[in-house]
Amino acid sequence: MEPQAAARAVLLVAAAYLIGSIPWGVIIARLTGGPDPRSLGSGRTGGANVMRALGPRWALVSGLLDAAKGTVSVLLARALGAGLEVELLVALAAIVGHSRSVFVGFGGGRGIAPGWGGLLVLQPFVAVGVLPIFGAVIAATRYSSLGSLIGSATAGVVIAALALTGSLPPAYLAYAVAGPALIWYFHADNIGRLLRGEERKIDPFGGRRT
């Protein structure tokens, strides 16, 4: 990679991290006068905790804005002709920014929304295809975290299979491993609570649960 291209890649990854760091859940809570999502449930800023704090309508808004962080990051890299490898890197950087936000003391969400938003640009059919799985798991169990874990793992397996069979460029194989790995890492405490039977449930159709 030439020095100019390398510098552009570094700047795009840094920009994606900062875009990912925008704490929409906290911003919405302040604008609406509602409780800070960090004060409830898991203490995170993502959609599930916004639902606990503000209800499903604002959780949907927060989730869409969080997803847009991944979408915008990848589209920016694509618009600047940075290449596939950089597009994949910025998609991952948005996940990290969302989960380790510089604006809220390196806390944040779990990464599923910006991860899905980036995937929507990179592989839209896979992104849309995992939505029913994500939704079905949450509807059946009321565990948002379990839906995120299974949904991200499913997307990773599908993308890895496509890369291994030559249907996608080889660079996607690393992305298929790194993306779900990051999301699972940021769900580490959820995984522990799931295994102990202590995970918090949500009501995806309207109520608030803690």
Segments (PLM) and residue ranges:
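Loop-to-transmembrane alpha-helix initiation sites
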Residues: 128, 144-152, 167-179
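N-terminal signal-anchor transmembrane alpha helix
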Residues: 7-33
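C-terminal ends of transmembrane helices
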Residues: 25-28, 95-107, 133-141, 188-192
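Short, non-helical or kinked segments that cap or interrupt transmembrane helices
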Residues: 35-47, 103-116, 143-152
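Multi-pass membrane catalytic core of lipid/isoprenoid biosynthesis enzymes
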Residues: 52-78, 107
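Helix-coil boundary and interhelical linker segments in multi-pass alpha-helical membrane proteins
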Residues: 1-12, 68, 72-89, 120-127, ...
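Interfacial segments of multi-pass membrane proteins
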Residues: 51-54, 77-80, 93, 97, ...
